[in-house]
Amino acid sequence: MMKQPNWLLHRAYVTPERVALIYQDKKWTFRDLADEVNELSNRLAQTSLKKGEAVGLLMNNHPQMVMLVHACFSLGFKIVLLNNKLTKAERRFQLEDVKAAALFTEPVYASDHKGELPVYTMETLPEAGQENVKKIENDFDLNQTATIMYTSGTTGRPKGVEQTFGNHFHSAVSSALNMGLREDDRWLIALPLFHISGLSALFKSVIYGMTVVLHQKFDVDEVIGSIEQHRVTMISVVQTMLSRLLSRLEECPSSLRCLLLGGGPAPLAMLQESKEKGFPVFQSYGMTETCSQIVTLAPEFSVEKLGSAGKPLFGCELKIQDGTRICRPFEHGEIMVKGANVMKGYLYREESTAAAFDQGWLKTGDIGYVDEEGFLFVLDRRSDLIISGGENIYPAEIEAVLLTHSHVKEAGVTGIDDDRWGEVPAAFLVTDHKIPENELYALCESHLAKYKWPASFHFVDELPRNASNKLQRHRLKSKGFLDDSN
């Protein structure tokens, strides 16, 4: 059994006066944070909850959420991170599936699950006793499940991903070995803490001794102001956030040394603009099952390897496989990864867990290739692949071309049935101006082989996305969605 000292308690012992957290105008040192977490742990200890039980956490980004995470760890509870964008029914499924013993939430959500399980807010938690009635966990078992996050469920029911303390620790260490670590680093988080890209920064904070600058949500003006005021050095972003920063700034703020870009391959035009304006974008590839990034492209390769997700983090491995055969450079296949940051498995789903692994390698379900130097290029989801007349067509490739048009704001491509070819691509576009179809075909003609051209264009008000804001291409072909297009 491999153990480590409780991360927050050890960090508060080693560097007590370092700033741990900044939220709006308030700051907490690691000593302050540990003291407040100890008080909160005492309150949680007055409940009937037992070590090893799973508890739901449904909150917006806020210092209280940070403290609840650490307090739950201190009492040995497994935390189920709930997406506040989900419907009540979707959250209920996850709480029942994980066998949650209680839910910690905010007053705005408290009534949603009343009567289903014990529900606590900061206002309704018992007052602290004179002493803890439960033992504080001074050590973490690295093989123990720390957090459970449900996959987005782009196909079928979502599954609970079991992430261990060891997964989170090795993710943080691999990230530091890849991106470097400085004493003055400050990481801004405006992504939701219920997603791995947000939550992982909390663990990096206590493992590195680094300040987290927390925002409740992404507001471009507030984020820019915060970067300048607090001399932020690192920020986690997705495409939409990076796009807004680029639209507001002509050059990168001087303190920023890393914009960690996740959430899927970025359009080449966006990466090129980032380069021209001096934004140090680290394009990355990862998922809930890998506890955030597992492949990252360092900025020094961003020109010659534009569009690549990079190479595996230190201690991680990558291969491209087609069936049982390892693919050669530039040959397309399924992306498979391995490392100490890869999940324990899917909770209560032995068959799904077994199907997800092949001799210790995680089968990601994504299609990609590596070049002759081992740089990864992510093409698409295997489930979204279009096979037209025997040719493989990747929707993301077509979407990237369509997004280069100045009036196309969002693009989604899916395969629709065709008597002659089996399937043909159909494009769904959100635009800010009417675009003649001949313009779109001319754009495709200059960038794509003819068999990749969309057979039809559909103009819609919005694209279907799940709670994680991921495009749900399979919903594009539904009759209801086709009927709403024009």
Swiss-Prot record:
Coiled coil, from the record: none
Molecular function GO labels: ATP binding; medium-chain fatty acid-CoA ligase activity; o-succinylbenzoate-CoA ligase activity
Pfam families according to UniProt: AMP-binding (PF00501), AMP-binding_C (PF13193)
InterPro entries with a match to the protein in the record: AMP-bd_C, AMP-bd_C_sf, AMP-binding_CS, AMP-dep_synth/lig_dom, ANL_N_sf, MenE
SUPFAM superfamilies named among the record's database cross-references: Acetyl-CoA synthetase-like (SSF56801)
Keywords: ATP-binding, Ligase, Menaquinone biosynthesis, Nucleotide-binding
Associated pathway: Quinol/quinone metabolism; 1,4-dihydroxy-2-naphthoate biosynthesis; 1,4-dihydroxy-2-naphthoate from chorismate: step 5/7; Quinol/quinone metabolism; menaquinone biosynthesis
CDD domains: OSB_CoA_lg
EC number: 6.2.1.26
Function: Converts 2-succinylbenzoate (OSB) to 2-succinylbenzoyl-CoA (OSB-CoA).
Protein name: 2-succinylbenzoate--CoA ligase
Taxonomic source organism: Bacillus pumilus (strain SAFR-032)
Gene name for this UniProt entry: menE
